[in-house]
Amino acid sequence: MVVAYKHEPFTDFSVEANKLAFEEGLKKVESYLGQDYPLIIGGEKITTEDKIVSVNPANKEELVGRVSKASRELAEKAMQVADETFQTWRKSKPEMRADILFRAAAIVRRRKHEFSAILVKEAGKPWNEADADTAEAIDFMEYYGRQMLKLKDGIPVESRPIEYNRFSYIPLGVGVIISPWNFPFAIMAGMTTAALVSGNTVLLKPASTTPVVAAKFMEVLEEAGLPAGVVNFVPGSGSEVGDYLVDHPRTRFISFTGSRDVGIRIYERAAKVNPGQIWLKRVIAEMGGKDTIVVDKEADLELAAKSIVASAFGFSGQKCSACSRAVIHEDVYDHVLNRAVELTKELTVANPAVLGTNMGPVNDQAAFDKVMSYVAIGKEEGRILAGGEGDDSKGWFIQPTIVADVAEDARLMKEEIFGPVVAFCKAKDFDHALAIANNTEYGLTGAVISNNRDHIEKAREDFHVGNLYFNRGCTGAIVGYQPFGGFNMSGTDSKAGGPDYLALHMQAKTTSETL
């Protein structure tokens, strides 16, 4: 009997002991910066000449690590190992699989600040963002372990007096996990452990800019007792290894988190039945958003401004849930805008390894160039009242940017930016605000700041997003509390951290015995 699930608490860094412990975590990570990490296939550590080089986005000269890069030949070897291992792993007891997750969670909990420090160095996350990422990784393992225990005996169905009917879940097969760089620990660990605890074997291809934290997680899984071959670590390029594995006839499902364009490409490729393939592949996809905070005229305006700033600029706006549009009732528009500008100008953009830094860098040069191109668009489509500047001389730093008076059909209101840029748009009334918020191909998160109960209930029904929040920001979903996933081009509405997520990695089997 396991204790009831409760999410991992965030660390209070105002407590001196916690601050010192995190600093020790940073020192430990700094002691092994620049190391080489192998591929892992069937428990065999394989070193290749071709490497993925991971650098600190806050300091391009600092090498975080070098990870061996898989070729198609090695990807094929990994597929064969995973396929063979599945024949035994699928018959393993769910209790044993859940126990591995619980042990892995305990190991990460003991090394919490070390893993967070890796995220500071490799992903450019400030302390609080890194700590939340690690806590979420722990949450996924604790939650999915418990969910598997709930599903292990199936779901009751009806039986007539002459029969005994059972409805049970069995694993799918080999899953390809393609994880993102923005939550390189939490989402990577969640996608991987959901697949393995459901009885599947895994080919893990982490994001190319953040592979070291995934390599360190492989160490955790091994220490937790995961048998060799269940999770195979195959970092590589999307065009070479990613496409090969997505197309492979032995791939049973693909779990992907990333951009809309790549997600669509995977979805299209997975739909094709290739020679030797005897099933229709399943795709579990989360693909981003164009998320809006709507501010009603009857609202706590200070809460509104703080929610917009926190949701827009947390982790430099590099969250699929980030607020990139603030749609505000015209009667309170100027007040909320001016207060948001004041709060934004108080933010510090600096080295995320320093406690108190609000914003670190963006992910890499490509991200920097893309975001700055949208800043340039913002100068044409509105008025820049805060930020608007970037500096990529040492790291990829961009100032938090507010663009005011943006038209509802402007590019800044339509296209995902994935950086610290938020567009402010004026609405005539609440219905108009909801119409603007829904005027996008995405549907991931949104928030409404309002004291009007009728408007809240209208939004609950008509604001078309997978995660809708009232009187708070639009980021920060907690595993098991706010299952996360969106509509439309935000993905397949696969609710990570929710009660139906594991079922996506399994197939239902009905057995009926005549008595």
From Swiss-Prot:
One MF annotation (Gene Ontology) recorded for this entry: 1-pyrroline-5-carboxylate dehydrogenase activity
EC number(s) per entry: 1.2.1.88
Classification via Gene3D superfamilies: Aldehyde Dehydrogenase, Chain A, domain 1 (3.40.605.10), Aldehyde Dehydrogenase, Chain A, domain 2 (3.40.309.10)
Keywords: NAD, Oxidoreductase
Family matches, as Pfam families: Aldedh (PF00171)
Family: Belongs to the aldehyde dehydrogenase family. RocA subfamily.
NCBIfam families: D1pyr5carbox2, PRK03137.1
Record protein name field: 1-pyrroline-5-carboxylate dehydrogenase
Organism of this sequence: Bacillus cereus (strain ATCC 10987 / NRS 248)
